[in-house]
């Protein structure tokens, strides 16, 4: 409802679900602060930035304390700071017992929030299950290292597919998780290893493999 003010829109949904206007107004002020919405409750929704409009949409959805929520791309238009704000509030709702279904292409958000996920390609399910179990099912075929060992020494190990720069370290892709033992032995030859993280692929990487590349 773009032509309504923030207050008018939120009050409409709150009263629609049986909430008293006085309670809803007090709750709206609280949510405006919690989500750091820029503007006044008398501002029209159409005048808000995309990010602030997204926050108001969430407030309209949760102000009456629903037990079941469906959120469609809740982090669209938000910068990292505001994404974190929204994510924390969604986590809080989850902790309070709300059942939440949300669709998103933000795999980082999915990984942080979801206990269970379903990935679709052209309307067909390609993956479904507990988030951690899905990640582990792909094997621990990636290693992040911060070490002076050369790319050539790493690539000489049978089972190392690639070595790519990542931040101040490097990402090593393996054919098999067991190759990680040899990589560690090579990296540890000089003694101290600042960082060695042998992990399962992220959901973002799995998404690219299964959905975009499938």
Residue ranges and their predicted role:
Residues 42, 53, 128, 148, ...:
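Structural motif corresponding to alpha-helix initiation and N-cap regions
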Residues 6, 131, 200-203:
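Structural motif detector for alpha-helix initiation sites
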Residues 140-214:
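Short, charged/small-residue-rich alpha-helical element at the C-terminal edge
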Residues 87-174:
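ABC transporter nucleotide-binding domain
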Residues 10, 25, 32, 84, ...:
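Generic structural signal for individual residues within well-ordered alpha-helical segments
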Residues 9, 15-18, 57, 118, ...:
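A generic structural signal for secondary-structure junctions
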Residues 1-102, 107-121, 127:
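ABC transporter nucleotide-binding domains
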């Amino acid at each position: 409802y773009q032509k309504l003010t923030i207050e008018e829109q939120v009050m409409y949904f709150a009263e629609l679900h049986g909430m008293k206007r006085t309670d809803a107004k007090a709750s709206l002020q609280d949510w405006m602060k919690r989500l750091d919405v820029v503007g006044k409750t008398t501002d029209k929704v159409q005048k808000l930035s995309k990010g602030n409009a997204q926050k108001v949409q969430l407030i309209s959805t949760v102000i009456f304390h629903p037990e079941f929520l469906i959120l469609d791309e809740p982090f669209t238009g938000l910068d990292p700071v505001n994404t974190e704000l929204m994510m924390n509030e969604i986590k809080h709702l989850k902790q309070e017992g709300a059942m939440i279904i949300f669709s998103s292409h933000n795999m980082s958000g999915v990984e942080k929030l979801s206990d269970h996920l379903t990935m679709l390609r052209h309307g067909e399910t390609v993956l479904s299950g507990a988030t951690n179990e899905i990640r582990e099912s792909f094997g621990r075929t990636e290693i992040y290292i911060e070490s002076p060992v050369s790319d050539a020494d790493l690539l000489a190990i049978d089972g190392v597919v690639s070595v790519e720069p990542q931040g101040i370290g490097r990402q090593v892709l393996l054919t098999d998780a067991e190759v990680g033992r040899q990589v560690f032995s090579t990296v540890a030859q000089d003694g101290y290893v600042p960082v060695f993280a042998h992990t399962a692929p992220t959901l973002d990487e799995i998404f690219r493999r299964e959905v975009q590349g499938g």
